[in-house]
Swiss-Prot record:
Keywords: DNA-binding, Nucleus, Transcription, Transcription regulation. The lineage of its organism: Eukaryota, Viridiplantae, Streptophyta, Embryophyta, Tracheophyta. This is B3 domain-containing protein Os06g0107800. CDD domains: B3_DNA. GO terms for molecular function: DNA binding; DNA-binding transcription factor activity. GO terms for cellular component: nucleus. Residues 37-141 bind DNA.
């Protein structure tokens, strides 16, 4: 269950312009982590565009940009620790692209994708403990490939014999029957087969 914490933007490890180290792994080992959000990455998130689009409602809630950073093409730098421990610190350029009205993580993202071997369908999750930010990923569940499926056995189906449109007995009596849209229409023997339609 997620811990609800009163939060202000100054608690984030946001650094304007990319200076400073930030996000080191020291101290606060007993801090409780608050789950923020996760995203199933798309082909464009892990492809040659080298960027992760952060869903707008999560970006504005958890990584708000001040007016100066929002209008600056440089944005800011977010520093994340690896949620699984170790000494890995991930520094990402985070900015708002007004052209597409989206929040994106750019510089540093391609390294994370490569190091974690992310593929479309994998999930990236974000959490925090106080002012420390954490990132984690998990692979999508292995799907059953069509090559691993066993072909089904051939099944023989015995269909009932089809019913002729004109019954032999009715044909012998001189009556004709026409089946139209599942309805049997009885035709008179003296009726002309041609229809005289006047429009």
């Amino acid at each position: 269950m997620a811990t609800i914490v009163a939060w202000e933007s100054r608690n984030l490890q946001l650094q304007g312009g990319g200076g400073g180290h930030g996000g080191g792994g020291g101290g606060g080992g007993g801090e409780r982590r608050e789950y923020m959000f996760e995203k199933v990455v798309t082909p464009s998130d892990v492809g040659k565009l080298n960027r992760l689009v952060v869903p707008k409602h999560y970006a504005e809630k958890y990584f708000p940009l001040g007016p100066a950073a929002r209008t600056s093409p440089a944005g800011t730098v977010l520093c994340f620790e690896d949620a699984r421990g170790g000494d890995s610190t991930w520094r990402f350029r985070y900015s708002y692209w007004s052209s597409s009205q989206s929040y994106v993580i750019t510089k540093g993202w391609s390294r994370y994708v490569r190091d974690k071997r992310l593929a479309a369908g994998d999930t990236v999750s974000f959490c925090r403990a106080g002012a420390r930010l954490f990132i984690d990923c998990r692979k999508r569940a292995a799907s059953v490939s069509s090559s691993s499926l066993v072909p089904p056995a051939l099944i023989k189906v015995q269909l009932p014999p089809s019913r002729p449109v004109v019954d032999e007995e009715e044909a012998a009596c001189g009556r004709r029957c026409l089946r139209l849209f599942g309805v049997d229409l009885q035709l008179r023997a003296d009726a002309s087969p041609a229809l005289d339609l006047q429009l």
